[in-house]
Structures are given as structure tokens and as C-alpha cells.
């Protein structure tokens, strides 16, 4: 596991970056977990989302890009140093670091709507790779509290990964009174 941050012009492992964003303690912030993300722009957008909401972003390898990717940087704009981004070698490593109480696996095959959940600080929101979503074995992981979906029109495949994470995090944050935010 390593935590990332910008050092000069290069994104690289560093110490835990509490940033200047809306941060709580490690146990009371929402956590976004991207399992093997493939598209750098989506992760860049999620970095920006984490900075804006005070959430943490956790990435599980293998990643479909490197942190020098221009698309990742461009999507994150100047928010990279305001976010906590941690890269984990494996999903087991992520669980060990996160010690999650509740994990919500977002998948189009779930029957429960994300809007039917009462979210609590510390919850983990897990999303799969853009091309295939969360594999069945990851959805069935013992850490997963519930599988949830974002409703869509019939016949549509899925939402964009970063958009899905935004919907989830903002709903959880809204339910918790936008704690720490400026309204």
C-alpha cells in the first residue's frame, strides 16, 4: 500500500496527505474504492470528488494507467494535493488498511437501490472496472454489506464510473447534513 501525492510535477508515493480539503478523521470520512480501474480520466475525476467532499479514494491494483498520465492529471485539475489517494496491491490489502464496518458494492445486477440505504461516516463505496464492473467473487466478498445499484432506464448498460461514485458520495454526504461542507 502507498498513499499518493504530487511532488513537484510528478505524482508519486508519499506520506498520508491530509490535504487542505474537507477532512475528518480516518474513521469518519466516506471512502471510495475503485477495484482495478482502467480509465485515467475517471480516476482523475474521483480524485477531484474526494478533494471536494473530504472522502478518501482507494485504488486496488492492477491499474489501467500510471500516475503520470496526462488524462488523470487533467481530470483532477489542481485538486490532487487536496485529496487522500491510497493504492493497494490487492483487495485483501485494502481491507486490512480500511478495516471497514460497512461496504456497499455498486453493481447493475443488484436489486437494492443506493437511495434505500442510510449511510454512515466510514462507509466504503466499492466500484468495479469500467469495462466489466465488479466481478462476482468481489461482490460476494465477506466484507461486502450489501450490493446496491443506481437506477437507470431499461436497456442501458451502466453509468460512467466517476459519475456513479459522485452520485453515491453526494447522497451519503447529503444524508449526513453535508458535514464539514460550505452550503
What does each model-found stretch correspond to?
Residues 1-183:
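Post-transcriptional modification and biogenesis factors for structured RNAs
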